[in-house]
Regions:
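Solvent-exposed loop/turn segments at secondary-structure junctions
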Residues: 46-49, 79-80, 105, 232, ...
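Conserved SGNH/GDSL esterase-like catalytic core that processes O-acyl groups on lipids
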Residues: 449-455, 459-535, 560-566
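N-terminal secretory targeting modules
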Residues: 15, 23, 439-455, 459-461, ...
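Structural recognition of the beta-strand scaffold that forms the well-ordered cores
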Residues: 52, 99, 281, 323-325, ...
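Catalytic His-Asp segment of secreted/periplasmic serine-dependent ester chemistry enzymes
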Residues: 562-638
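Sec-exported extracytoplasmic/periplasmic mature domains
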Residues: 62-67, 74-81, 240-244, 264-275, ...
């Protein structure tokens, strides 16, 4: 389990003239002192529900531990359950898929080969390039169908006749479209049925599906579009959406075993699906299994992207018919998720430590989120003023005792208990395995800190919610100024026409009443490293002219090799050496561990976890400076 976040220490670089040795960071305030939490930090593990197969776990088992796909499946679904791998009696059975983006819409289709036909058409010799089915106005379950030899996706408001489409007739219950090749497993992806998705912006995406695309109504007589495909053809559109096809090339091809295991899990799960009686067995979103079809065009005439992959096609073909059965012979509903954080959730399948998931070390194997008390209370206003957030975990092992069973949100007006899954949903957490740590203000004996100014760029702008949850409880008087592309000094900026006002401009715009006691400058990524020393000097001079007691710079991560941020950091360190009222917070060192790569989206900007961790770093550093008396009014007394 992680230690209390406020107690985690990082390096602070400060001018030698003001360095005070031997002082530890400030003790965090506690509930016993009568303080209420200003925020809550949620530490968690994994991405998804954690039941059954972990996709990243499969990848780790295959590429690091050298396991076969059979071993992977036996680990996640076998063992104490007595489940085993088996063969389907009907491996070519049909899957029917509700295509959710088409809800209440017409069904328009295109054929690259000009061979589209309607299965209900009495004249099966007719072929078209484009067709559209619309429910007849004033009638239920009666479809009017038009066809054209032009390549076109009609909008809902378009007149088919005015667009050159000819009416084929009216058809009861369904309108089902195929091309000459769409039901052939060997067909190229673009020889299948192209479905015109609803207009987004100015474009109609066209998504291609194997098998049949059908217009029909659900039990409430609402328009729906369904794809009917052979099971393995359907899986060719599922497996690459659930696990990256590129995994198959990893570790000299050993990653194929992760894809094979995924194919079997997806197949067994599919066979158990029967969600929408009279309509479809399954859906195309993560509520069921993500299904992308065979190919995609971003507009009707745009260059296509084939969504199927040779690796995942191979994984499906090489495991065809294989599913998981119970000892009694029933097909197992083989749930799976992205990452279990190093331990399966238990339930239908035993709770197991997952060395494969730990080895894969996915970006969401561990994660951090931060929420202010106001954000928590906004979800549960009946509790009044927040006093605590506590979790009850399953006790089956791992951080915080295991997966979260329920969460109690307590306040001055009462408390609310919700399930771990419900809390996860309310706050968009990656998984239901987490623990909650309160964030309090400064200890009551801490020195008073005057008004503060924060000047930041897009990094600073991105942490505004986390700042309110983690920093503001202890430092409430902060003038927070952060915008994209901001630099220290505009004229020497990489993009001088953007990010205005620059740091100098922000400082110069302050009225006398706004002059801060402490200034935090989180800038530099947009500055030219070659002029950084001069830029920093100008900012220091501007702040000194306004009698700022302590000037704090945050140095830069050097992960991005395309810029010489080490030179920028050297300029900041030199400024701290020569200016006794300047401190530099060493974010570069604090974020340099390989495991911290999950904090960055592009080696500069931060992921959601990175935003929480960066803000926590700032809070810890400010607390350390406060303990040393460097941001309180009388540092000489320390």
């Amino acid at each position: 389990m992680r230690i209390s976040p406020i107690k985690r220490c990082f390096v602070v670089l400060i001018g030698l003239a003001t360095f005070v040795a031997g002082l530890s960071p400030a003790r965090p305030a506690s509930a016993e002192e009568g303080q209420l939490p200003g925020g809550v930090i949620i530490y968690g593990r994994g991405f998804g529900h954690g039941r059954g197969l972990s996709q990243y776990g499969s990848y780790g088992w295959a590429t690091v531990h050298g396991w076969s796909w059979e071993q992977i499946l036996d680990f996640y679904y076998g063992g104490a359950t007595g489940n085993s791998r088996s063969m389907l009696e009907a491996p070519n059975q049909e899957m029917t898929v509700w295509l959710s983006v088409m809800n209440t819409k017409q069904t328009g289709v295109v054929s690259d080969s000009g061979t589209m036909r309607l299965l209900e058409d009495p004249d099966q010799g007719r072929r078209f390039t484009s067709m559209v089915a619309r429910e007849k106005s004033g009638a239920q379950r009666v479809y009017q169908v038009w066809g054209s030899n032009q390549r076109k996706c009609l909008n809902e408001s378009d007149s088919p006749e005015a667009a050159g489409f000819a009416l084929l007739g009216e058809f009861n219950e369904t309108a089902s479209f195929v091309t000459n090749a769409s039901q052939d497993p060997a067909a190229a992806a673009l020889d299948t049925v192209g479905l015109c998705e609803p207009k987004s912006s100015s474009l109609n995406q066209v998504r291609y599906y194997r098998g049949i695309v059908r217009a029909m109504n659900n039990s409430k007589n609402e328009n729906r579009t369904i794809n009917i495909a052979r099971l393995d053809d359907y899986l060719r559109g599922v497996v690459p959406r659930e696990s990256p096809a590129s995994w198959g090339d990893a570790a000299g091809g050993a990653g194929m075993n992760a894809l094979r295991a995924q194919a079997v899990a997806a197949r067994s799960y599919s066979v158990t699906e029967n969600r929408y009686a009279g309509l479809a067995k399954t859906c195309d979103t993560q509520d069921c299994q993500v299904y992308g079809g065979a190919a995609l065009r971003t507009s009707v005439n745009a260059s296509p992207s084939v969504l199927e992959s040779a690796n995942t096609d191979r994984a499906v073909a090489e495991t065809t018919g294989v599913i998981i059965r119970t000892p009694q012979g029933a097909v197992v509903r083989t749930e799976f998720s992205s990452s279990n954080g190093g331990r399966t959730a238990g339930g239908t399948f035993p709770a197991l430590v997952d060395a494969g998931d730990l080895s894969a070390d996915s970006s969401l194997m561990v994660w951090t989120r931060a929420f202010s008390a106001a954000q928590i209370v906004a979800k549960y206003p009946q509790v009044g003023i927040l006093t605590a957030v506590t979790t009850t975990n399953d006790g089956l092992g791992g951080d915080w005792g295991g997966y979260t069973l329920d969460v109690t949100i307590s306040g001055t007006a009462g408390s609310v208990k919700v399930s771990g899954w419900s809390f996860r949903t309310s706050f968009a957490l990656p998984a239901p395995w987490f623990g909650a740590t309160p964030v309090f203000g400064a200890p009551l004996e801490s020195g008073v800190v005057g008004s503060m100014l924060f000047v930041g760029d897009s990094i600073g702008q991105s942490i505004a919610p986390e700042f309110a949850a983690i920093v503001a409880p202890a430092y409430p008087s902060i003038n927070f100024q952060a915008i994209n592309n901001r630099c220290m000094v505009g004229p020497s900026c990489v993009t001088p026409d953007k990010g205005q006002p620059d740091a100098i401009g922000v400082v110069n715009s302050l009225s006398a009443e706004q002059f801060p006691s402490v200034a935090i400058v989180q800038l530099g990524y947009n500055d030219d490293p070659n002029t950084m020393a001069s830029d920093v000097t100008q900012v220091i001079n501007a702040l000194n002219a306004r009698n700022v007691q302590r000037i704090i710079f945050v140095n830069l991560s050097t992960r991005r090799a395309s810029q010489n941020y080490a030179l920028s950091n050297a300029a900041l360190a030199a400024a701290a050496q020569t200016n006794p009222n300047v401190s530099v917070l060493d974010w570069n060192a604090a974020s340099s561990a390989p495991s911290a790569s999950r904090w960055f989206s592009d080696d500069v900007h931060l992921t959601t976890t990175g935003r929480a961790e960066f803000t926590l770093f700032l809070r810890n550093q400010l607390d350390s400076l406060r303990a040393q008396g460097l941001i309180t009014p009388n540092p000489e007394s320390v």
